[in-house]
């Protein structure tokens, strides 16, 4: 799952998977803008069949946040 999340981020942002670390912040470290973040959230929802409400999406700042959130939602 973690690798798939990184692949989605790399595809959406046009960056190398090697640049993506759990502590990487989407905006500060990976160069995402607010639209990129919205598109990433939608891609995660589709890929992992989870719903991420806006109030939760606002709290997701790093790659690790996404990994933990989806694992929690999927009961892993």
Swiss-Prot record:
SUPFAM superfamilies: ACP-like. Keywords: Cytoplasm, Fatty acid biosynthesis, Fatty acid metabolism, Lipid biosynthesis, Lipid metabolism, Phosphopantetheine, Phosphoprotein. One of its GO terms (molecular function) is acyl carrier activity. GO terms for cellular component: cytosol; membrane. The keyword Lipid biosynthesis applies. Gene3D superfamilies: ACP-like (1.10.1200.10). The keyword Flavoprotein does not apply. InterPro entries: ACP, ACP-like_sf, PP-bd_ACP, Ppantetheine_attach_site. The modification O-(pantetheine 4'-phosphoryl)serine is found at residue 34. 4'-phosphopantetheine is transferred from CoA to a specific serine of apo-ACP by AcpS. This modification is essential for activity because fatty acids are bound in thioester linkage to the sulfhydryl of the prosthetic group. It comes from the Bacteria. Residues 1-74 form the Carrier domain. Belongs to the acyl carrier protein (ACP) family. This is Acyl carrier protein. It comes from Persephonella marina (strain DSM 14350 / EX-H1).
